[in-house]
Every structure is written in C-alpha cells, then in structure tokens.
Amino acid sequence: MSRAGTWLKMLGVGIVICVGGPALVEKLRPTDAELIQRYNPELRERSMREGDRRAQEFDDYVTKLKEWSKSDKSIWFAAKEMEEKRLAEQQAIQNQTKEQARIQREEMRKELMGEK
C-alpha cells in the first residue's frame, strides 16, 4: 500500500474515532428523565422536593468560586478567608444576642427590685 493510502486510512480511522466515539457515548448515556424513571418512588419524590434547593446551592457555590477566582490569591486561601469572615460575623451576632439578653435580664431585675 502506498504512503498516501496509509495516510488516508489513518485519517479515516481518526475521523471514525473522533466522531463515532462521542456519538456512541451520547447514544448509550441515559437522559435525566430516564434516570429519574429508574429511581424508586421515595428517591424520585425526594429528588423532586430537593431539586430546586440543590440547584440554588450549586449556583451560589459557582458564584462564590467566580468571586474567589477574581482575587490574586489561590481559591483555597480565598475560601478560607471567606469562611473566617463568616465565622467572625456569626460570632459577632452571637455576642450581640448574649449582650441583649444580659441587658434584658438586668432590666427585669431592676423592675423586680423596684416593685418589692
């Protein structure tokens, strides 16, 4: 076989692999609807219930990743800083709630002592 024939044969094989492989995968892979039909009824119901919430959580996560990737730092460091910031805010809210409860208790004591 000539050199050109070998090249044409290899080109044909390459095209079959590059086009046929993904086409075969698409044909064999089930659609989302087919997968959901295979679920048992409990899983199907739970999937329908929690689907919107999970989609929203994923969208929020992707948004955070985009925000973290804008900084010059590694995504891991940016995520850690965001987590530390969230924990600090949570701690501040908790401290504020404790302080309000303490002030309320003191006011109640003063009222009780004034009434006696």
Swiss-Prot record:
Residues 90-116 are annotated as: Disordered. One of its GO terms (biological process) is mitochondrial respiratory chain complex III assembly. This is Assembly factor cbp4. The chain crosses the membrane at residues 7-25. Pfam families: CBP4. It is a single-pass membrane protein. Residues 77-116 form a coiled coil. It comes from Emericella nidulans (strain FGSC A4 / ATCC 38163 / CBS 112.46 / NRRL 194 / M139) (Aspergillus nidulans). It is found in: Mitochondrion inner membrane. Belongs to the CBP4 family. One of its GO terms (cellular component) is mitochondrial membrane.
